[in-house]
């Protein structure tokens, strides 16, 4: 199910993913969000009334609106405009090294990485910046790396209907670097293949070779 914003009178409030919310009567507004940040500051042992923290609840609420803005955007809108006059081009289109940040859905700490996305056109191509925007849409949500990899591939396959899609994500998880085992510098790699990329080993090899060159 697509994510949509639950409307209220506060235009700075955060969007809500309806797919993950089964019951909701009234979405919290900006004052409630700021109060929640203030509560967390108190819980952490801080004084939210000291000079350096007076504006922090407001700043955090505003930052979260941007950091999780992907809930209010749709890949269908981004990929809806395509080009058919491509002089018969039907080979791989690859956009690699797309930098992104996301947030772990388990601890709400950053995931920092890059995505490599390729597809095999079936008569239609999309502007290259649109591929990066799709990555951004799914990244600016609470995520697992496995989910974001699959979501990018699924949306491109479903909307553009190419002969195949390949997605690789390499990322460092701050939940591993900053807490628990505290292993800085470790990276996680995930891949998803559809269509010809999944069924034909030579297409996978081409994709993997190109992203490493």
UniProtKB/Swiss-Prot annotation:
Any one of the GO BP annotations: tetrahydrobiopterin biosynthetic process
Disulfide feature: none
Enzyme class: hydrolase
UniProt GO molecular function: GTP binding; GTP cyclohydrolase I activity; zinc ion binding
One Pfam family linked to the record: GTP_cyclohydroI
Pathway: Cofactor biosynthesis; 7,8-dihydroneopterin triphosphate biosynthesis; 7,8-dihydroneopterin triphosphate from GTP: step 1/1
EC code(s) of this entry: 3.5.4.16
Catalytic reactions on record: GTP + H2O = 7,8-dihydroneopterin 3'-triphosphate + formate + H(+)
Signal sequence bounds: none
Keyword terms: GTP-binding, Hydrolase, Metal-binding, Nucleotide-binding, One-carbon metabolism, Zinc
Residues holding Zn(2+): 104, 107, 175
Transmembrane helix listed as a keyword: no
Family matches, as PANTHER family: GTP CYCLOHYDROLASE 1, GTP CYCLOHYDROLASE I
Assembly information from the UniProt record: Homomer.
Protein's name in the database: GTP cyclohydrolase 1
């Amino acid at each position: 199910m697509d994510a949509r914003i639950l409307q209220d009178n506060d235009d700075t409030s955060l969007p809500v993913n309806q797919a993950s919310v089964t019951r909701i009567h009234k979405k919290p507004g900006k004052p409630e969000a700021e109060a929640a940040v203030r509560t967390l500051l108190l819980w952490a042992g801080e004084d939210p009334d000291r000079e350096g923290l007076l504006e922090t609840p407001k700043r955090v609420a505003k930052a979260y609106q941007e950091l999780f803005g992907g809930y209010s955007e749709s890949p269908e809108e981004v990929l809806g405009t395509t080009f058919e006059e491509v002089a018969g081009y039907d080979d791989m289109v690859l956009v690699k090294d797309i930098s992104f940040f996301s947030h772990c859905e388990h601890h709400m700490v950053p995931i920092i990485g890059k995505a490599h996305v390729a597809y095999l056109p079936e008569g239609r191509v999309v502007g290259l910046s649109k591929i990066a925007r799709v990555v951004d849409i799914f990244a600016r949500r609470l995520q697992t790396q496995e989910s974001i990899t699959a979501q990018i591939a699924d949306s491109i396959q479903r909307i553009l209907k190419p002969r195949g899609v390949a997605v690789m994500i390499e990322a460092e998880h701050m939940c591993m670097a900053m807490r628990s085992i505290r292993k800085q510098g470790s990276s996680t790699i995930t891949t998803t293949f559809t269509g010809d990329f999944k069924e034909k080993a030579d297409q996978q090899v081409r994709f993997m070779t190109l992203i490493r060159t």
